Amino acid sequence: MNKSEFFEREILLIESEDLRDFVRFFFNERVGAWFWESGASASGKYHPKFAQGEGGLVRHTRAVAMVCEELLRMSTYAYMKSEYKDYARVACLLHDTRKYGRGDEEDKDCYKEHGAIAADDVYRAWHDFFTGGDRCPEFLTLAIKSHMGQWTEHREDRPFTNIDRVVHLADYMASRSFFDIPQIVEEYNEDRAREIVEALEDGYHIINDKVVPPLEKVFQKVWDLAPEGVEVFEPGRARWNEMEANP
């Protein structure tokens, strides 16, 4: 199961097929492991209960996307071009993808600038994905950069366009402690169960509720990364071959 499938319901609301594919690519290839495991709030003070604990940031992101859809029905935003509505949808899905860092390990130092960092990485990923295509839309990156509204680190990065405003409002409303969407928890649990079942079928292991690759995949990754001619890994390869021959 690809990680983007946790958001497939929301991705399918994006009208542009190219943008749908880009969002899937970003979640599957450019989002660190911490994103799928972390809660939406480090302190637990500023987000509803369903957005706390493992997977909380995933559930929060889905809530933001759902609120965005409701806001887009209001007259203030309903008359935006379909293209602009899609930018808002994409920004809502990707706005917190750098909240705690760029790599697989959490880096809380990124928090204050996470909107700007995410916008920059979306820009880079866009040009990796759409090779030879149009430039990444500034409307998209600005909406990601400004999603914290009045709490954005730099005044010049605060919401300006209607796209910016709808993304910020969706994030703000979905972050209120009194907010609750039971459906999100139910669907997250269903998706997580499916992920575990598919991982077990593919030979992965579940350790402490984490999906862990089989030993041969770990060894293979080490061997693939080894510089050509380096023999230090050969004892490990020989030992693995022996284990396979004598299970």
Each model region followed by its residue ranges:
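Short acidic/histidine-centered micro-motifs embedded in hydrophobic/aromatic stretches
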Residues: F25-A33, A40-S41, A91, A143-H147
